[in-house]
Amino acid sequence: MEDIHARFHIDWPGFRLDVDLTLPGRGVTALFGHSGSGKTTLLRCIAGIERVSAGRLTFNGEVWQDEKIWVPTHKRPLGYVFQEASLFPHLTVLGNLRFGMKRASGPVRVSLDQAVELLGIGHLLDRKPDRLSGGERQRVAIARALAVSPRVLLMDEPLAALDLKRKQEILPYLERLHDELDIPVLYVSHSPDEVARLADHLVAMEEGRVIAAGPLKETLARLDLPIRLGEDAGAVLDAVVGERDESWHLARLDFPGGSLWTRDRGIPVGRKIRVRVLARDVSLARQRQEETSVLNLLRGRVDAIEDEDHPGLALVRVRVGESPLLARLTKRSASALGIVRGQEVWVQVKSVALME
């Protein structure tokens, strides 16, 4: 099975990195954590930008670094996208892409035309970087990284320097990379929204350590992680648009375990879509509530309960069929309902965020 194995130890003044993990060789793996958690340092170690004496790195069994072997960055078949688009100002967009092609080695995994089409930059090829918007520059930087025909693409918070409008413009292009290219992506981010929208796998980091790693949906639904805290705690579901009710302007999203109704956004029936359900938008009941404004009522079973940092709050994980959902309750409510593990409950979902 294709995979990336990374083991690094750094002990710098004021910072320590100690990781030993295996990353999947397919899909998008998000390295997630707060600033200073070590995610960018780990990415730079994988790229060979940081040379760490105590380290070992293999890609699909091929050694890139150990006690005796060191493959320098320029000889590693990888593409790297920084926070700021580092384009050559004296070259046109096409010139920047051709520069990337010069670094390509081995079989062509992504052609120049394919990179241009995937990132939607065909109309920009004759422009210099100073005539591009921030989002356009970053799309060109990603296309140049792909022009290297990399075996793995490393992305260090590529949207961090962009405003919200530019982020929304570029996210669909990142989704296309995920859907149309068979190249593993390691994606550094501290944004739960980006992670929920793009990632297949999650590596959560804190103070230079990996505190959790695994498939995105199951890892986000864990209750023993600091990432569960705050307003961003929630679950991710992969759904399919099952019906559009034009009379009420609603759409039904079917997922393993049930269905959710949400505002109709014109997405065609049959389209696969990822949705995010925040814990603050979920409540629980012992009996089905008939007279309520909440449209989404699902049958579930309590799977786990965990205290929050706030003494008055608890986080409850409920399984709806195969799918986990999180609910944030006051402890008073949990006590009044007699919430215990294994109990059957009605899950009331007030709001659903479409990751599109």
Swiss-Prot record:
Keyword Transport tagged: yes
GO MF, one annotated term: ATP binding
InterPro entries assigned: AAA+_ATPase, ABC_transporter-like_ATP-bd, ABC_transporter-like_CS, Mo/tungstate-bd_C_term_dom, ModC_ABC_ATP-bd, Molybdenum_import_ModC, Mop_domain, P-loop_NTPase
Keyword entries, A-Z: ATP-binding, Cell inner membrane, Cell membrane, Membrane, Molybdenum, Nucleotide-binding, Translocase, Transport
Protein name (Swiss-Prot/TrEMBL): Molybdenum import ATP-binding protein ModC
Localisation per UniProt entry: Cell inner membrane
Xref: PANTHER family: ABC TRANSPORTER I FAMILY MEMBER 10, MOLYBDENUM IMPORT ATP-BINDING PROTEIN MODC 2
Family indicated by similarity: Belongs to the ABC transporter superfamily. Molybdate importer (TC 3.A.1.8) family.
Residue ranges crossing the lipid bilayer per the database entry: none
Subunit structure: The complex is composed of two ATP-binding proteins (ModC), two transmembrane proteins (ModB) and a solute-binding protein (ModA).
Residues involved in ATP binding: 33-40
Domain ABC transporter positions: 1-232
Membrane topology: Peripheral membrane protein
Catalytic activity: molybdate(out) + ATP + H2O = molybdate(in) + ADP + phosphate + H(+)
UniProt domain Mop: residue ranges: 291-356
EC number from the UniProt entry: 7.3.2.5
Pfam families xref list: ABC_tran (PF00005), TOBE (PF03459)
